[in-house]
Amino acid sequence: MKLVSNKILFLATMVLASSSAFALKDDVNQPINIVSDNQSLDMEKSVVTFTDNVVITQGSIVIKANKVVITRPAEKSGKKETVEAFGTPVTFHQQLDNGKPVDGKANKVHYDLGNEFLTLTNNAELKQLDSKINGSVITYDVKKQQLKANGNGKSRVTTVLIPSQLQQAKGK
């Protein structure tokens, strides 16, 4: 039973690893809380699934989804953990060290821990104060700190920048 608890704790820790690059420095030291209506664990496949009204919190980070699936491949496979969240939409909120909030949403969020690569798919949006980016797909390479937004054949990427926020960014 203790092995099962340790696996769940480790996998749950992976849920928020993607957001720790943006969040308050102290957030990563806070406890991770996952609340859902249902939870299932497949020990053979090392998959934990949380469903219905999933709320994940750690410090200032809050993630809400309909379903979250955390997969931890066998160590010998050479693959790393992945976290997938599904919702209409999945939402997240974080407080940055500079005090500004970041909000995001998408119908699907995928995080590959091995590559430290975050993908928001379908109706993806990132917003900080009044500035925002909308696209069909938004990707973020955590290591390189590079963001890319793509439209699809029907819609284009939309970016809204507020001049006062641009001036504040230049001054810092």
UniProtKB/Swiss-Prot annotation:
GO terms for molecular function: glycolipid transfer activity; lipopolysaccharide binding. The keyword RNA-binding does not apply. Gene3D superfamilies: Lipopolysaccharide (LPS) transport protein A like domain (2.60.450.10). Residues 1-23 form the signal peptide. GO terms for biological process: Gram-negative-bacterium-type cell outer membrane assembly; lipopolysaccharide transport. Keywords: Periplasm, Signal, Transport. GO terms for cellular component: cell outer membrane; outer membrane-bounded periplasmic space. It is found in: Periplasm. InterPro entries: LPS_export_LptA, LptA, OstA-like_N. HAMAP family: LPS_assembly_LptA. Component of the lipopolysaccharide transport and assembly complex. Involved in the assembly of lipopolysaccharide (LPS). Required for the translocation of LPS from the inner membrane to the outer membrane. May form a bridge between the inner membrane and the outer membrane, via interactions with LptC and LptD, thereby facilitating LPS transfer across the periplasm. Belongs to the LptA family. This is Lipopolysaccharide export system protein LptA. The gene is lptA.
